[in-house]
Amino acid sequence: MLKVIDHPLIKQKLSVIRSQKAGHDVFRKNVIEIASLMTYEVFRNYKLKEIKIDTPVAQDVLAYDYDKEIVIVAILRAGLAMVPGIVNLLPKARVGHIGIFRDEKTFEPNNYFYKIPDVPKDSEILIVDPMLATGNSAVYAIERLKKDGFKNIRLLSLVGVQEGVDNIEKNVGKDFPIFLGSLDEKLNDKKYIVPGLGDAGDRIFGTK
């Protein structure tokens, strides 16, 4: 279930990081800001529980708090850059990590690290990765989390292509929630998104 978050601030900031002139400092800053902006829409339907609090002038006032644990799962390494923008709005959220690298010949995912907080299986899980290209890494992450018993899982990426969306819908289900800032045109022969962002990990961390 694809949702492209159409917002002028997201469009403008995506334009900044699409430019090859953007250095790693500018790129990283805008990735954080875009992730923060997109968080509003991702958690639009998140259910809160009612609590009672005392204000400076009243007692037993109706208020709201988290109903379920929230876990942000960053796909390493590029997904790390999105975490600060999200936890800035969700400070109680826990953070997990899945290390995946793509084989440059087969384009298949290889897992080298997996660490998820010990939380109830009905927790809200948000996988974050700036790019949804082939979708193979996302499918691996989703299936690994489902194997561990998690059910409430969604994916947040800055940009993606239909091929990646189709891969998830085919292997996970058409109702799986996917949130993108932009649905780009296609993948090139090296499986890079076009027009895309280039190698998001290298651009975030200033490496090549």
UniProtKB/Swiss-Prot annotation:
Binding positions for uracil per the UniProt entry: 193, 198-200
Gene3D superfamilies registered for this protein in UniProt: 3.40.50.2020
Pfam families: UPRTase (PF14681)
GO terms assigned for molecular function: GTP binding; magnesium ion binding; uracil phosphoribosyltransferase activity
Record's cofactor remark: Binds 1 Mg(2+) ion per subunit. The magnesium is bound as Mg-PRPP.
Lineage, opening ranks: Bacteria, Bacillati, Mycoplasmatota, Mycoplasmoidales, Metamycoplasmataceae
HAMAP family (alphabetical): Upp_B
Necessary cofactors: Mg(2+)
Reactions catalysed, as given in the entry: UMP + diphosphate = 5-phospho-alpha-D-ribose 1-diphosphate + uracil
PANTHER family to which the protein is assigned, alphabetical: ADENINE PHOSPHORIBOSYLTRANSFERASE, URACIL PHOSPHORIBOSYLTRANSFERASE, CHLOROPLASTIC
Protein name: Uracil phosphoribosyltransferase
Gene: upp
GO process annotations (BP): UMP salvage; uracil salvage
Keywords: Allosteric enzyme, Glycosyltransferase, GTP-binding, Magnesium, Nucleotide-binding, Transferase
NCBIfam families from the UniProt entry: PRK00129.1, upp
Role noted for this protein: Catalyzes the conversion of uracil and 5-phospho-alpha-D-ribose 1-diphosphate (PRPP) to UMP and diphosphate.
EC id: 2.4.2.9
SUPFAM superfamilies: PRTase-like (SSF53271)
Recorded metabolic or biological pathway in which this protein acts: Pyrimidine metabolism; UMP biosynthesis via salvage pathway; UMP from uracil: step 1/1
Activity regulation (record text): Allosterically activated by GTP.
InterPro entries: PRibTrfase_dom, PRTase-like, Upp_B, UPRTase/APRTase, Ura_phspho_trans
Class in the EC hierarchy, top level: transferase
List of residues binding 5-phospho-alpha-D-ribose 1-diphosphate: 77, 102, 129-137, 199
CDD domains for the chain: PRTases_typeI (cd06223)
Family: Belongs to the UPRTase family.
